[in-house]
Amino acid sequence: MAKVMNLTPVHASSIPDSFLLPADRLHPATTDVSLPIIDMSRGRDEVRQAILDSGKEYGFIQVVNHGISEPMLHEMYAVCHEFFDMPAEDKAEFFSEDRSERNKLFCGSAFETLGEKYWIDVLELLYPLPSGDTKDWPHKPQMLREVVGNYTSLARGVAMEILRLLCEGLGLRPDFFVGDISGGRVVVDINYYPPSPNPSRTLGLPPHCDRDLMTVLLPGAVPGLEIAYKGGWIKVQPVPNSLVINFGLQLEVVTNGYLKAVEHRAATNFAEPRLSVASFIVPADDCVVGPAEEFVSEDNPPRYRTLTVGEFKRKHNVVNLDSSINQIININNNQKGI
């Protein structure tokens, strides 16, 4: 265990070769962008249209006055930093290299990328619904279970409100996203990106689309989120007390491609650590997801296969990270064995 912990980015004195990525795969972001700031306290019609506009343009939305108080956000940042500031020996009891194990600390990202690792340590927690029971979470720091549990409940509430607004804007019944489609356990990734000795050769997370329904990101104050846009990459500048929400692959399937899950990645920097918290709104594994009839017509036939979420996850795990959603679940894909 000590040997493994010493190889995590937090404790490494130099970059292990497995964390160094080929330079030709690290196209730098060229533009600093502030995503449109959507004030959720404004009129409902205005907010709904702004969410649709930003979601269609970027696949991401940024919201303020979202209902989670500034003190709650500060408590969340504080307890997450407190966890990663603990001595290595205290964190070691929560560390696991077993990808099937939940409520664990791991390093290098959970993506299958042919042995490549990424400059990140992650505390991954499962928030069960409807109980919200956090007894299986780390018992240190003392306030972690209470603070992260309270925040996660609120973050899920923000996601459900945005999904209701999308229903209104897309002509879906108001409860379309209530039930199994959003009823899996919330997966909470508390991401710690240490300063990198070589940001030009490391990434915190590789380019990817989230395979959930929707992700709520507490972005932190240090830039690092980059999103694919018009053939390049743009840097997203953090806005105080905001949340950044992006559409997952399941939402793309439901809308038959009308809303897109957009690739994004996490850049590293030399100067200071970055902390962010991603809350993934996940369907139940046995939930069957396919294009909704509202998005299918004779002129616009289904573009995606209808699969259980469990089937989708298995297919996604065996596909190379650079593959697009079309190679995974496009109904016209003729590849064998996926």
From Swiss-Prot:
Induction: Up-regulated by manganese and zinc deficiency or by excess NaCl. Down-regulated by iron.
Enzyme Commission number(s) of this protein: 1.14.11.25
Cofactor mode of binding and number, as noted: Binds 1 Fe(2+) ion per subunit.
UniProt binding sites for 2-oxoglutarate: R274
Stored InterPro entries: DIOX_N, IPNS-like_FE2OG_OXY, IPNS-like_sf, Oxoglu/Fe-dep_dioxygenase_dom, Plant_2OG-oxidoreductases
SUPFAM superfamilies the record matches: Clavaminate synthase-like
Family: Belongs to the iron/ascorbate-dependent oxidoreductase family.
Name the record gives this protein: Mugineic-acid 3-dioxygenase
Organism: Hordeum vulgare
